[in-house]
């Protein structure tokens, strides 16, 4: 099975991903499509300039092949941003995933983005694409996918994670909500110096 959390930058999504890693029963992927969007052989991000970092052989298509191969071995959870792949949203592609969304107040998200990348482009913010994907999935499936509000998640983590697990059809593992200090989320990130997407 493939579980996809559609988020936006600076939405506490990496913390949610870290919690999902603690479960131990999922192959967790950190923004796999984002790596191709930013650093693939044909980067799609709007601030890319000739001579910037690229990775030969890395593309949205190669990432998708890798995800499917992993999912054939064990369940996969990925946290990613819908604006990285809005050009490949087809009913067939989207049908491979059990979808959920993590939202956060834009005032908090965008000010946090500005703090980390003062030169960010509006196409990197991702709110229009996140909403568009939610609406598309609702239309395709006849029912809206689960949505977690970051503020609710921070205020009542046990209740929110339990509800999330029930909604996507996985066991609730309460022990995943706590972990030893000192873990390094950047070890799972392709971004130089680790992820800035808290």
Question: Residue spans of the language-model regions?
Answer:
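Conserved phosphate-donor/acceptor-positioning beta-strand/loop module used by diverse small-molecule
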Residues: 94-113
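Short, solvent-exposed loop/turn segments at secondary-structure junctions
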Residues: 9-11, 33-36, 82-85, 106-109, ...
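Glycine-rich phosphate-binding loop used to anchor ATP phosphates in small-molecule kinases
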Residues: 65-88
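PAPS-dependent sulfotransferase catalytic core
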Residues: 1-71, 177-198
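Hydrophobic/aromatic beta-strand patches that form the interior of the parallel beta-sheet core
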Residues: 3, 27-29, 98-101, 146-148
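Residue-level preference for the first positions of well-ordered beta-strands
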Residues: 2-4, 74-77, 144-145
């Amino acid at each position: 099975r493939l579980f996809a959390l559609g988020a936006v930058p600076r939405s506490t999504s990496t913390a949610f991903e870290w919690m999902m890693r603690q479960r131990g029963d999922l192959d967790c992927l950190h923004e796999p499509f984002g790596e191709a969007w930013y650093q693939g052989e044909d980067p799609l991000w709007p601030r890319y300039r000739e001579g910037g970092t690229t990775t030969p052989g890395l593309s949205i298509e190669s990432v998708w092949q890798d995800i499917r191969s992993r999912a054939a071995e064990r369940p996969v959870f990925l946290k990613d941003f819908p604006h990285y792949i809005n050009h490949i949203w087809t009913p067939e592609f989207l049908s491979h995933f059990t979808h959920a969304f993590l939202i956060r107040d834009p005032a908090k998200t965008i000010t946090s983005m500005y703090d980390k990348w003062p030169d960010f482009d509006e196409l990197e913010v991702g709110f229009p694409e996140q909403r568009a994907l939610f609406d598309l999935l609702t239309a395709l499936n006849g029912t809206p996918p689960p949505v977690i509000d970051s503020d609710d998640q921070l205020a009542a983590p046990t209740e929110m994670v339990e509800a999330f697990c029930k909604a996507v059809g996985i066991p609730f593992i309460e022990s995943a909500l706590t972990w030893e200090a000192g873990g390094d989320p950047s070890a799972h990130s392709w971004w130089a110096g680790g992820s800035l997407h808290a």
